[in-house]
Amino acid sequence: MEKSKVYFTDFRTRLGEGLPSKLKRLMKAAGIQNIDMDHKFVAIKLHFGELGNLGFLRPNYAKAVADVVKELGGVPFLTDCNTLYPGNRKNAIEHMYCAWENGFTPLTVGCPVIIGDGLKGTDDIEVPVKGGEYVKNAKIGRAIMDADVFISLNHFKGHETAGFGGAIKNIGMGCGSRAGKMEQHAQGKPEINESLCRGCKRCMKECANDGLVYDETTHKMHIDHEKCLGCGRCIGACNFDAIHSGDAAATKDFNCRMAEYAKAVVDGRPNFHISLVVDVSPNCDCHCENDAPILPNIGMFASFDPLALDQACVDACLKQTPLPNSQLADAMAKEGFCDHYDHFENTTPNAEYKTCLEHAEKIGIGSRDYELIKIS
């Protein structure tokens, strides 16, 4: 079987050529022009960033992608679906204001922003998952499925539940409607280590479903698993590492469901994927803050295969030296630190991210075997 091709360029620039232009060259080297986009609606799936977070991809990159789509005759729009948790992206109105405030407007990116699952996150369509073991019908935002062509523009970084966020997470979790996100999180309920809990209640502010309870007697937090949706938002909210992912089986279930949702999105239509390994924060861009990067900026990757793309980004990251004064460096400096010889596992030991890659390959999203082609 022929290896999937992944194209790569670093962040070095020549005089007179900025990074947006270099991104356009990367896309064309990878063959995006081979997709028929003439008068086709093209969904560009990205994360607009939570208000207060500055780690998300700059709008200039989105504009570069939209420009190439328009050059090829396509009709692009930027899209994402609403969230489960508190913040500024849980309905389309707040989500649009958040996108605009973070710089994603028609004037700056050259195309409109459309929230994929509608006003309240309920405008979805059930899409059969071919070969799905965990999900038979994925609930995907209708606007995303209505598009003729699908492009993912991914900020590759760490993630407190998935281990890392790349193409598969941006597609699978990101394109799920609110009901779809709930289905993916259904089995992965977090746990609290009471010996580490300070009772600061910060995690309570992050829970949309009253799933965290403060015990007035012990002055510790508890999780009401009947109310908990399993979104993992509380994990990143805790500064004391008191909240962690549940058992490994539940975490594996989460990763497999996410892979199957991604398959539902890309199956049966032209798709193309771009990942930027830059500002590699330890947590998701869903947070209203972004911690210091755990790894150096590496570069931009592009491929028709989202799985090969994720694998290439992981491999590139694992070759890097952790940055000082970061969550990863702090974890490695702790007494009794157990080295997993893996930057993402050292940052989030219970994430089980490899399960997602393995399952994605099993169900036919793509291949983990790739050829890396570098362009200057």
Model segments located where?
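Extended, low-polarity segments enriched in aliphatic/aromatic residues
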Residues: 2-61, 68, 72-80, 85-376
